[in-house]
């Protein structure tokens, strides 16, 4: 088996990417059958202390990351979203309500990602350019989602 060097080769720079999904434990797709969206408000949130720990680690190592953040979380923790940006990280969208793209109509999907983009930009006062679909839910069967993402990207505050 050929080994890949763990340090840059002479004349080459090492480049890594770090991304974080900002969602609460009860919002993950695996829990959808057990935790209704109508129950989210009543759940004890862990997102704020968890993101604060991640921010502290990134600061300790001088690293930057992209935080794919739910609009739902941003509305409830605007100070956390502002801190992510203030500490030099990229803010990106993970949709508003962590709904799989594959389980939505094109219109519902566009509404979800559009709302998320507007909420994030209004709170953080930065342009949101990135998007990650919940549970990697875009594929050949719903390739229409790419057009929706492009349309949402063109929307300005």
Regions found by a protein language model. Give the residues of each.
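Catalytic alpha-helical scaffold of carbohydrate-active enzymes acting on polysaccharides/glycoconjugates
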Residues: 2-130, 135-157
């Amino acid at each position: 088996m050929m080994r890949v060097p763990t340090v840059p080769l002479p004349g080459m720079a090492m480049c890594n990417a770090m991304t974080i999904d900002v969602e609460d434990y009860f919002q993950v797709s695996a829990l959808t059958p057990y935790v209704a969206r109508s129950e989210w408000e009543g759940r004890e949130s862990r997102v704020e202390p968890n993101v604060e720990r991640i921010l502290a680690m990134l600061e300790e190592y001088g690293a930057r990351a992209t935080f794919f953040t739910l609009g739902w979380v941003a509305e409830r923790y605007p100070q956390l979203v502002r801190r992510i940006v203030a500490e030099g990280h990229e803010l990106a969208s993970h949709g508003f309500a962590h709904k799989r793209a594959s389980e939505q109509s094109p219109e519902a999907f566009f509404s979800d990602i559009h709302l998320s983009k507007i909420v994030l930009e209004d709170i953080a006062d930065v342009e949101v350019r990135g998007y990650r679909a919940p549970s990697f839910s875009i594929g050949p069967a719903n390739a229409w989602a790419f057009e929706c993402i492009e349309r949402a990207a063109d929307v300005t505050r």
